[in-house]
Amino acid sequence: MASQPEEGFGERLRKEVTVDTSRGVRATSTAQAVENFEGWYADQRDTQMVVEEATTGERVGFRTPNRFTPEYREMLYAKAQSLERGLREEWGDLLHTAMVTLTASTTEEDGGPRPLVDHLRDLLSSWSAVYDALRHTLEDREFEYLAIIEPTTPAGNGPAGYAHIHLGVFVKGPVVAEQFQDVLDAHVKNSEGAGREAHRAVVEDDEDEAAVSIRRSARPDREDGIENLGAYLAAYMAGEYGVEALAMPAHVRAFYAAMWATGTQWFRPSNGAQRHMQPESDDEESVEEWEMVGIAPEGDLEDEIIEVDPEQPRDDPYRRLRTPPPGG
């Protein structure tokens, strides 16, 4: 799942995917991490949050979606749809979109597979440089972005289950692919394992795939182009739409385990994009006041309810891998 540091502290992972040894703290295998993720997910799906109405004492239980549930993915899909719809209303026919794809090598120098967590760290290590390059590239232009981390599939060129980034850029006015080469270069320079050949904005060989695609945002009354780039990105986010995490293919579950183990969020919108993705406010004032009082581990309010104080600090679910110094 993650490589062991030669000395000192390494990756910060969920405790469920770490093991104490005589030589510090190491990560479990990927197979064990997937199994532990599946157990955690099943427990989460069975558990209901219990809230109580302050005046009547009525109690209601509900399941809270985590970022791996179909409900959460459906919510993100709806948010992505509203993003481009809002920008189209604001910019009209001036809205153009670009999709920039960022990857990193999935193999070690000796040809062996790179641990999923190490690869994810490599991929994300360039993010601040990528953002700075994007801002510089589109200086004096109005733009927003939506970055989504997705798993590779068996249909791709490399092994399935590793992460890659689709960066959707929404620009007021025309853009061309060549403009984004500096963004790709920033990723290559700041991400270990990011190859230059895989990050070319324009390619001459038809057999190669460019890392940038440009589209003019389609209008509802036109058939050409992609109707909604935001929704197009979200539709490919981490598995088939509406399917439970435990029913996903093995490569998606491995990807989920890496995201869960590291606490990585796969949806990264710009501040302006977030504003367009917010739901419309409800002007009606609610007179009911609900307070969380506990959880029902088996999902039955008539059964055991464990009281929870929402003000009580929670234990940190993470810890770092560690290798003590010689003699330590």
From Swiss-Prot:
One of its GO terms (biological process) is DNA replication. Residues 296-328 are annotated as: Disordered. Keywords: DNA replication, Plasmid. InterPro entries: DUF1424. Residues 299-310 have a biased composition (Acidic residues). Pfam families: DUF1424. It comes from the Archaea. Possibly necessary for replication. This is Uncharacterized 36 kDa protein. The lineage of its organism: Archaea, Methanobacteriati, Methanobacteriota, Stenosarchaea group, Halobacteria.
